């Protein structure tokens, strides 16, 4: 194998230098998570993702084939990241309530722009013939983790999921801009993020952000 096998020519991403194909794939998926999360599946093009990743659009198509396959790759990566964060929180060996630690881990994923939103986007695509089954399977995996691995009761698992969906909604609405301006939304944001409101205000997407 040559020293440069598996690397993408510089022309694929002007101004970025050589990068391994695996690293370039990770870069594209991270951009896809952010852009799909903000603009949705229908509203996003492969060119949008390419520009966000500073990659040529033909290379994105060459690597993933279609927008559908790119979305599935981004969704799969997001689900694996989510479940890995839950498992790490559950098994960290530190004292404390497992649900609280997993909840904190979920909030910590806000640093990965678009992760919460792409999950919400996927969960609204149940009628899609390809994405729908994948989204349902992913949601079922999360439920099984909460029940079987984390040992939550059915009621606790439902409440955990409900809070997660509320958090996703607040992030998707880019509601943090209302903090301190609207009393009701300030109260709700404080309730959703009681221990991490400062971080959320700093990290969450805001109105006007491209993603």
Whereabouts are the PLM-identified features?
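Active-site-adjacent scaffolding segments
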Residues: 1-10, 34-38, 65, 72-74, ...
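Hydrophobic/aromatic residues within well-ordered alpha-helical segments
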Residues: 67, 74, 78, 102, ...
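Amphipathic alpha-helical interaction segments
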Residues: 97, 101, 105, 118-121, ...
